[in-house]
Structures are given as C-alpha cells and as structure tokens.
Design a protein with these regions (language model features):
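Polytopic transmembrane helical bundles with strong interfacial aromatic enrichment
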Residues: 2-189
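Aromatic- and Gly/Pro-enriched helix-to-coil junctions and flexible linker segments
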Residues: 163-279
Length: 279
C-alpha cells in the first residue's frame, strides 16, 4: 500500500472511530430510512472478512519482531497495511450491525453484549494500529494484543451466533442426546412433551427473548398465547383461521412463509400435530 493510500485509510479510520462512538451514544434515537436498511442486513455477510483479515494481521504483527521479518520491508509494510484494512472492515461491519440492530425483532441482553463487544473489538484494533510503531511495542505487548483481539473475536462471535441461531446451537446435537427419553403417549402432556419440542427445534431461533421477530416469543406458553405483531397465533378449535397454520401452509417462496426459506422446515407429521393441538 503506497503512502498516500495508507494516509487516506488512516483518515477514514479516524472518521469511523468518531462516527461509531456517536452511533453508540445515540443508538436509541437512531431511526433508519428504508433505503439504509439493506446496508444493515449486509452485516452477516460482511463480518467474515474482518475476522479473517484481523486474525492474519495480528499474527503477522506478532512475528514481525524476529530478525528476518524485522529487516524485511515488504513484510513490515504488508502487515501494517493488512491491520489497517482489517480494522477498516471491522468498522464497516460495526456500522452495519448498529443499523441492523434498529430493525424490529432485535432486543435483549445478548444484543447488547454483541453490540458492545463488537464495538470494543474495533476500538482495540484501532488502538493497536496507532500504537504498533511505538518503541515500547515489542513482542510481549504484541502477544498480549493478539490474545485480546482473538478473545474479543471469539466472544463477539459467540453472541452473534446466539442472536442468529439461538442458544446452544453449537452443542445442541450433543446435549440433545442427554434429553429425557420419550414420554409414553398415555402419560404425555400435550404442550410440554409434543408441541414445545417442535417449536424449540423449528421456531425459537427467531422467536425468543433475544431475537423477537414479529414481536413474537415462542419459548413459553405465555408468549405463545400472547401472540405477536400480527395478532393471536391461533384460534383454539379453528385451524382455518389460525395464523400459525396459515403461515406454515404458504408457498416456500412467500415472504411470510414460516419457517423462512433456508431454515429447517416443519415436516408433515409436525404440521399434523400442531393442527390437532389447535383443534
């Protein structure tokens, strides 16, 4: 990266720090126009780039103090440029995430943790970039910096995954093997033993306390009975006018079809069980 381009990047980095700080302080007052919402929705696509680049950059920065690398102008310049690029991309991702957080359905402590750890990661990476050429910035400090950045990436990613996929997404295949054995039909409690497991498997990743899509929570009976933004979820004894089954039976390419395209779909048996429960 030539000096002029790097200087421009550094100026943009300063602007990002100020802009992100402003957004964090006034997030609750932020109202996005509809034409900016697609930018926020690019957050989940964009975030992979700064993760990969920051890990590579911070690793290269750690090893630049060896005799061979320290004397290699290309190595030192490339590691510096890579760190700048990764930090700038992290800034773009944070802005997108803050925009996305203003959309309906994102709420709760998990969102707050993801927002603040993500912002902290960006500020830490920015600080490392500005301090990396100080005389006291040597291998021990670089190692500590690498550890902090890596830990921040893991923590931020964990909360982001929880928002996207729900609690226990990674360990669910293992922990599910320890779930209590199937209850005999004659002893089953219909909601707790039949209906709730279906909702937990297919619906609660988007309809929980952390990610309240459509203002609908499906994690407990109170939320199910309350319904969401579109009204009651079902009418007992009347499957024809129940919103739950209406959305389930929509064509897969319909925007309001549930679960959304790309998510695990309800099986015919599960739909039949939900219909019988409503009746």
């Amino acid at each position: 990266m030539n000096a002029k381009l790097r200087q421009t990047g550094e100026q943009v980095l300063i602007v990002f720090n100020i802009f992100i700080l402003f957004l964090l302080l006034f997030t609750s007052k932020l109202v996005l126009p509809y034409w900016l919402q697609p930018i926020g929705r690019l957050h989940t696509l964009m975030l992979h780039f700064p993760i990969a680049i920051l890990i590579l950059a911070i690793g290269m920065d750690l090893f630049r103090f060896s005799a061979n690398n320290n004397a290699n102008t290309f190595y030192t310049n490339f590691s510096r440029s890579l760190l700048l690029a990764g930090t700038l991309l992290a800034g773009i991702t944070v802005v997108m995430g803050l925009f996305l957080s203003r959309e309906e359905g994102y709420t709760g402590d998990t969102l707050q943790w993801h927002k603040w750890t993500g912002a902290a990661l960006f500020f830490i990476a920015s600080l490392i970039y500005w301090l990396r050429n100080k005389k006291w910035y040597r291998t021990p400090v670089a190692a500590a910096s690498a550890f902090i950045v890596t830990a921040s990436l893991i923590i931020t990613g964990h909360y982001g995954a929880t928002l996207t996929h729900g609690d226990n997404f990674i360990m669910q295949p293992i922990t599910s093997t320890f779930i209590k054995p199937p209850v005999p039909l004659e002893e089953a409690v219909i909601f707790a033993d039949v209906i709730q497991p279906i909702l937990e498997k297919k619906c609660t990743s988007c309809h929980n306390a952390h990610k309240l899509k459509g203002e609908l929570a499906l994690t407990d009976s109170l939320g199910i009975m309350k319904g969401g933004k579109s009204g009651k979820l079902f009418v007992p004894g009347n499957i024809a006018t129940s919103l739950l089954l209406e959305r389930v039976h929509l064509s897969l390419d319909e925007e309001k079809h549930m679960p959304p395209e790309g998510k695990p779909q309800l099986t015919g048996e599960e739909i039949a069980l939900l219909s019988s429960w409503i009746n």
